Amino acid sequence: MLRILNMNEYISLNHYLILSSLVFTIGMFGLFMHRKNIINILMSIELMLLAVNINFVAFSIYMQELSGQIFSIIILTVAAAETSIGLAILLIYFRNKGSIEITDINQMWG
């Protein structure tokens, strides 16, 4: 007879929180270490948002509440839209100026 495993028996809330804090720390480290390249900054911010989503889903499972998972889906959707718009703006800027360095973007004039 096949036994259906309950994932909460093997993976506790602490495991999810440790994973989330590690992903957030990697994102924060990437944000501070790669301040020159805007693509790396966007990827680091996405990692930090992913860590927040892991927290939402973990607490949603722990509390047996569906709202955390719904918030996570909404956050992922909005983050994907923001990233696509940001990359489109960067692509147009790169075509015009030839560089996407932070120092060059700070010197933009009307």
UniProtKB/Swiss-Prot annotation:
Subcellular location, principal: membrane
One Gene Ontology cellular component annotation held by this UniProt entry: NADH dehydrogenase complex
UniProt-listed Enzyme Commission number(s): 7.1.1.-
GO-annotated molecular function: NADH:ubiquinone reductase (non-electrogenic) activity; quinone binding
Record key words, sorted: Cell inner membrane, Cell membrane, Membrane, NAD, Quinone, Translocase, Transmembrane, Transmembrane helix, Transport
InterPro entries for this protein: NADH_UbQ_OxRdtase_chain4L/K, NUOK/Mnh_C1-like
Membrane topology: Multi-pass membrane protein
GO process terms (BP): ATP synthesis coupled electron transport
Catalysis: reaction(s): a quinone + NADH + 5 H(+)(in) = a quinol + NAD(+) + 4 H(+)(out)
Record field: transmembrane: 13-33, 41-61, 73-93
Compartments (UniProt record): Cell inner membrane
A Pfam family reported for this protein in Swiss-Prot or TrEMBL: Oxidored_q2
Homology family: Belongs to the complex I subunit 4L family.
HAMAP family in UniProt: NDH1_NuoK (MF_01456)
Assembly, per entry: NDH-1 is composed of 14 different subunits. Subunits NuoA, H, J, K, L, M, N constitute the membrane sector of the complex.
Purpose: NDH-1 shuttles electrons from NADH, via FMN and iron-sulfur (Fe-S) centers, to quinones in the respiratory chain. The immediate electron acceptor for the enzyme in this species is believed to be ubiquinone. Couples the redox reaction to proton translocation (for every two electrons transferred, four hydrogen ions are translocated across the cytoplasmic membrane), and thus conserves the redox energy in a proton gradient.
Protein name: NADH-quinone oxidoreductase subunit K
Gene this protein is translated from: nuoK
